[in-house]
Amino acid sequence: MMKNKQAGNTLIFVLVILLLITIIGTWAIRGAITSLNITTNAQAQALLVQNSDAVFFQLESYADHAVKIAKLQLDNGMIGYVNKPENKGKELVYCLRKSEKDDKYNLGKASLVYWQGASISKNEMGQDGYCKVNKATDFTSDRGAVVTRIGARSILEGRKDWGHMYEGSDSETYGGKDIGTIIINATSFIPNLSTASADEINKCVMNYPSFNVVVDGVTKDSVADCLSKLN
């Protein structure tokens, strides 16, 4: 009888030990997963910043390249096009594709998006400028991780005297043409980290400008706002 009782106690003791090991192991796994998420998020943020910054670094380098900056200022160049009076407030959209290293800002590869009252206009120049996350060619590199959407818009509000003129020019230079105030926005995101479908993400990229616009007293969402809501 004593032997059976001892065996029972031993069994209970062993079961308790196994239960403790299971609990500790679960805590360790949860801790590891949490740490992995933090690392992944940090890496993702760094990757997004790197891709968006690359857009601005390249555009800044154009300022020292007479031919490249001149192309941007032509009527069919990014700056020249959005600076036309009839295009003020409209956003010219490009997809930063891995295959287009040298000719990113070709007007034939751009799209135009803007609000017309409460409706969005997005097909005036076709849809080649909108990134599609279900197309491997629309990612920024062969890794197929990041998609970057570039938006350019010329505005009239908030300009300072002479701040809209070409450097070293006067009111008669280039026929009195000015560059306006050009705002460039680069929106980068990693589709694989989202639970949203490709169709939902593509709609955000196409149906919203990069900038918040007030229409009839209502502030409209931007591309970033739409993507954030998708999670």
In which residue ranges do the predicted regions lie?
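Aliphatic-rich helix starts adjacent to a transmembrane/signal segment
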Residues: 2-4, 13-51
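Residue-level detector of alpha-helical recognition elements and their boundaries
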Residues: 30, 36, 66-67, 74, ...
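N-terminal alpha-helical signal peptides/signal-anchor transmembrane segments
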Residues: 48-67
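Short, glycine/small-hydrophobic-rich surface segments
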Residues: 62-97
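Intrinsically disordered, low-complexity regions enriched in Pro/Ser/Thr/Gly and acidic residues
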Residues: 96-231
